[in-house]
Amino acid sequence: MDEPEDRGTAFIFADGAGAFLLGPANEPGVGPTVWGADGSEFNTIVVAPNWLEIRDTCAADGEFVWPTLHMEGQKVFKWAVSSMVGVCYQALEAAGVTPDDIQLFVPHQANNRITDALVRGLKFPESVIVARDIVMTGNTSAASIPLALDGLVNDGLAKSGDLALMVGFGAGLAYAAQVVRIP
């Protein structure tokens, strides 16, 4: 899906898959989800041409053009750093906790500059462990949060009972944040 010549996407994105398995627990461990979308910026991350355009082009002249990802990285960066801190605070409030109660911060692994800006904006104590596996895995889109948390668990940095704030965002521009307790 990446255009190999597009320096804004080709070297950032990686392949990955992740999932969270939930089961019964004696105490609630998954906080409320804060989610939404900012449709005013829908065109900052797009796949083009879209499938309707491909269908119409193929019907008209028989040519098939494979769609590729296009991203306005600076716009996404500015939107993420100006919007996601507020979304994180909403998730903390919905869970009834503060930044001081959090042990782990697991943001979408878009890039380290966004993560740095979010950490500064949330004013976490120094003890909060911040997932930064983008340097090893790249931006694996929706898989980045499960993979980053798995890395923290495997490295012994995430402990049972820790509270983790997770926040993700992507095309649309859609977003979600939630506080979870590590089992």
Explain the meaning of each model-derived region:
Residues E5-K78, S82, G86, F169, ...:
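Condensing-enzyme catalytic core mediating Claisen C-C bond formation in acyl metabolism
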Residues W51-I54, A94, D155:
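A structural signal for alpha-helix termini and helix-coil/disorder junctions
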Residues M1-P4, E27-P28, A59, V87-Y89, ...:
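Short amphipathic alpha-helical surface micro-motifs
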